[in-house]
């Protein structure tokens, strides 16, 4: 079953085409990786799916329903959660509170930043037990009272994943989940992604770590200049002459 369908997306910024007729589909229960050089349109695609930017043409459907024109918080409520390259953690807030705030964050970033006195007014309503379970899942149960800024970069990546999971979404959009981290943490995150897939989650990720992509992906999609240039199982896509010419050489 197709969980996500992207149809002929076009988006230009100051005359530069970031998306140029990009189409793809994500099957339910798959781990799909999107690769491509810088400027290929990968993060622009994620922003379009999540409603952070309006496209010039084309459409996005999730579970058969159009996402066009919906605000990001409405798209999140339909069952799409995401991470960002720049992590977007609250560095001066505890690990536990970051995850608890994650329940709010995916409902619209403007909501998160506009809440005044959240800690005193709404902490009693936060699902602390669920947040602790998510931190245990990612291996940060011993860090719940630490400030986010005191975590290593790899641990911050794990915390970002826990925050993403707070919405219990069906589709996870992960922007470079293992970029810039040590091999041990990379393997931990890849293991977590496989566990999430086994539990019924669908994962669509952007990643430059080709070895990680080959290890974890069911399908790899290669983008170049805003278009899809290849798609298929990793072992086949990585040998595609067009891919080798455009990206891997």
Regions from the language model: what does each represent?
Residues 58-65, 78:
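Conserved ABC transporter NBD signature motif
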Residues 111-143, 191-194:
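Conserved ABC ATPase "signature" region
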Residues 147-151:
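Conserved ABC ATPase signature
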Residues 35-37:
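The feature captures the beta-strand-to-loop junction immediately N-terminal to the Walker
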Residues 172-176:
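Catalytic Walker B motif of ABC-type/P-loop ATPase nucleotide-binding domains
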Residues 213-215:
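A short, surface-exposed alpha-helical micro-motif characterized by mixed small hydrophobic
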């Amino acid at each position: 079953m197709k969980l996500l369908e992207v149809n002929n997306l076009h988006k230009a910024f100051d005359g530069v085409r970031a998306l140029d007729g990009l189409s793809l589909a994500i099957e339910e229960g798959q781990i799909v990786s999107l690769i491509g050089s810088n400027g290929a349109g990968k993060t622009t695609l994620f922003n379009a799916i999540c409603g952070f930017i309006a496209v010039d043409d084309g459409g996005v459907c999730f579970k058969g329903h159009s996402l066009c024109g919906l605000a990001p918080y409405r798209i999140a409520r339909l069952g799409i959660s995401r991470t960002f390259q720049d992590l977007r953690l609250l560095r001066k807030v505890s690990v536990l509170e970051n995850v608890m705030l994650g329940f709010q964050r995916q409902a619209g970033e403007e909501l998160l930043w506009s809440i005044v006195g959240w800690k005193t007014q709404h902490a009693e309503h936060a699902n602390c037990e669920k947040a602790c379970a998510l931190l245990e899942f990612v291996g940060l149960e011993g860090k719940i009272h630490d400030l986010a800024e005191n975590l290593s970069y790899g641990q911050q990546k794990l915390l970002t994943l826990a925050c993403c999971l707070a919405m219990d979404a069906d589709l996870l959009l992960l922007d470079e989940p293992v970029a810039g981290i040590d091999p041990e943490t990379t393997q931990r995150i890849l293991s977590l992604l496989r566990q999430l897939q086994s539990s019924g989650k669908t994962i669509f990720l952007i990643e430059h770590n080709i070895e990680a992509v080959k290890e974890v992906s069911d399908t790899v999609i290669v983008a170049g200049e805003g278009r899809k240039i290849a798609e298929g199982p990793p072992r086949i896509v990585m040998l595609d002459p067009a891919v080798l010419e455009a990206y891997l050489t």
